[in-house]
Regions:
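P-loop NTPase catalytic nucleotide-binding module
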Residues: 1-27
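C-terminal effector/interaction modules appended to NTPase cores
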Residues: 22-170
Length: 170
């Protein structure tokens, strides 16, 4: 399938998998955010934004086990420390402030339907991104993509194993 022209690659994305708050005297004020960095590198000093709150901060430290680094590369499992104590929880996304994603409530996407019950407009489903889950409504089914790549055909629903373009409202 041809990737959508709004598909983003090469931008730093850090989904927070856990918040690290050691309960020891030595690290009584430590607050770190652990996860796996994707898309691009992140450096100490980078301005970052936490989604969905849009809270801003600066990366002060990057940890990997007991080592500190000035920069982390995409694919690295790391812990980030931020300049100020802000509310960051599991499932939040930390991104470079200069690389904010486009935030939408109305999404056009391609899906492969895997349920024996047909997907129809008006139906409600949960959509999950990382660990965050929201209720979404199928606004419309635009078409079915032929599996032999011969084209598309208009459709108003998707049956099991059909690939189609749909509009989803979050």
């Amino acid at each position: 399938l041809k990737p959508s022209d709004v598909y983003e690659t090469g931008k730093a994305r850090f989904p927070v998998q856990t918040v690290i708050r050691p309960k020891t005297e030595q690290y009584h004020d430590f607050r770190g955010y652990a996860g796996k960095l994707s898309g691009n590198n992140i450096k100490v000093g980078d301005a970052v934004t936490v989604l969905p709150s849009l809270t801003e901060s600066i990366v002060t430290n990057i940890h990997f086990f007991d080592q500190q680094f000035d920069e982390a590369t995409a694919g690295s499992s790391i812990t980030l420390e931020l300049e100020n104590d802000i509310n960051v929880t599991r499932g939040d996304m930390i991104v470079k402030s200069s690389e904010l994603p486009k935030i939408e409530k109305d999404i056009n996407t391609t899906i492969c339907w895997m349920d024996s019950k047909k997907l129809v407009p008006g139906a409600k489903y949960f959509v999950q991104h990382n660990t965050n889950r929201v209720l979404a409504k199928i606004d419309s089914v635009k078409n079915i993509i032929e599996t032999d790549f011969s084209g598309t055909k208009e459709a108003s629903q998707l049956a099991i194993n059909e690939i189609g373009e749909v509009n989803i409202k979050l």
